[in-house]
Amino acid sequence: MPKISSSFDAGAISVIDSTDSQNIRLALRGDNAASFSQWFYFRLQGAAYQPCRIRIENAGQSSYPEGWEDYQATASYDRSNWFRVPTRYEDGVLTIEHTPLAGSVYYAYFEPYSHEQHLNLLGDAQGSGLCQIDDLGSTAQGRDLNLLTIGHQAASDLKIWIIARQHPGESMAEWFAEGLLSRLLDHQDPTARALLDCATFYIVPNMNPDGAALGNQRTNAAGADLNREWQNPSPERSPEVYAVRQKMHETGVDLFLDIHGEEALPYVFAAGCEGNPSYDARLAALETAFKTALRQASPDFQDEYGYPKTAPGQANLAIAKSYVGETFGCLSYTLEMPFKDNINLPDDDFGWNGQRSLRLGEAILSAILAVCPQLRPDETA
């Protein structure tokens, strides 16, 4: 008889009935302390070579039901190699149809990035000899919140801050961080060397380790959406934002990137600070220059489709990119990657995945280097 389980790092699903491989009935499980639901990650055993129909019956009540349209679930036999499987969304039900070729197979909303991978990422970064790892404090459940500092930390250095995975179900964000770190810590990469001659990087590859381990889609263990906590974070409800924001005020910020995943739109795009009260022509020109450079660095990035522009002065300053952009008067972006495929460069077998996220992380360093000379206002003007 088929068995469904999810008692592992980031696992998340509720089982209604798994006795019939042709009618496995499941339900999305909400975040541990909030009503958000979208992420799923579970294991199926005992159905090798059997045509399986897996129905997630409450998909229509998820946080982003439009995210299921033209979506294909991911699957893996070894949790290292993930591929897309036939999936359809009808009448509020997400149906996965797949014939497993082994007795154990995993299904997930997107290719996961585990806590073990996170710890290995920190270890590899430290082993490069270029990276200082600092403890910013502990999460609500006692997990470490680490900051990676790369550069000479000279007073004159540009201060570049990059955070990822405020929303824990957006695992592509940490894949992106891995790619960025891999290139930045490459002693032989000329772009990385040029950047570290003029800038110090402050990188938080996982802002929400509790939520990631719990299998949450959007919130931390206390039920807080971290990307709505930046104006008034607290050590109790949002210790992650509280600690990172405090460190930012110590270092200053010249460029800020907040890395995310987007459920509905099948594109890579950026959202800027046009709605901030202090937004001006200099920042508008910087945004344009950065997007142009990123398009040149990676054909996966585009600027035709994205979120609607925010009206002048109407930005929500509780959102990270808006708060940081307004507070420090700097170039500040949210970068979004799709849970679906990138419709401009589709891949039927793998869709948008961890490796493509990683490659985008590598590419963004070229865009950062291109705008470095423009990041600070001309003090002599």
Where are these regions (language model features)?
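Extreme N-terminal flexible tails
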Residues: 1-101, 105
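Glycine-centered structural positions embedded in regular secondary structure
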Residues: 11, 87, 137, 357-363
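Short, Φ-rich (hydrophobic/aromatic) sequence segments
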Residues: 40-44, 122, 290, 294, ...
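A short beta-strand motif that forms part of the nucleic acid-binding face
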Residues: 58, 111, 164
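Short helix/loop capping segments that flank catalytic or ligand/cofactor-binding pockets
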Residues: 64-65, 108, 115-118, 170-172, ...
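Extended acidic/polar, glycine-enriched regions
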Residues: 88-137
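Active-site/substrate-binding loop(s) of hydrolase catalytic cores
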Residues: 130-150, 155-317, 322-325, 332-337, ...
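His/Asp/Glu-rich mid-to-C-terminal helical/loop segments that flank catalytic regions of hydrolases
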Residues: 344-381
